[in-house]
Amino acid sequence: MSEEKNLLEVSHLKQYFPVRKGFHTIPLKAVDDISFAIKPGETLGLVGESGCGKTTVGRTLLRLYQPTAGRIVFDGDVLFDSGEQYDEEGKIIVDANGNPVKKKSIDVDMLPYRKKMQMVFQDPYSSLNPRMTVEDIIGEPLDVHKLYSSRAE
């Protein structure tokens, strides 16, 4: 029996946001070096206290935020790879000057992938727009991805 490939593979994902402190800008580490894999048919729930980065992970995977570093592979396609090289222990390989050793970075158009990926939030009252009808909420992704030929469909 062959080993089933991963549907989603996340390696060393980092999402930092710049924060101004006086004359300096420092990085706020919202997500710092997270790695996991999901096989077809599996479900992953991110659980943690408020402000720990759960939503940021989801938005970064969907590329609503540009990742700071790491690698995202969905169904065998590399969606993002910042190019850092890692050793067996997960540490970034650096050159003699202390600079990260990189290969070519990869960045792709996400529209074809977003119809296959989604985030589901636990609280439906903050997840669903109360000004939209159920028909509008369900129909919005169908409109975006042009998944019907007529309005009746």
Where are the predicted features?
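ABC transporter nucleotide-binding domains
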Residues: 1-153
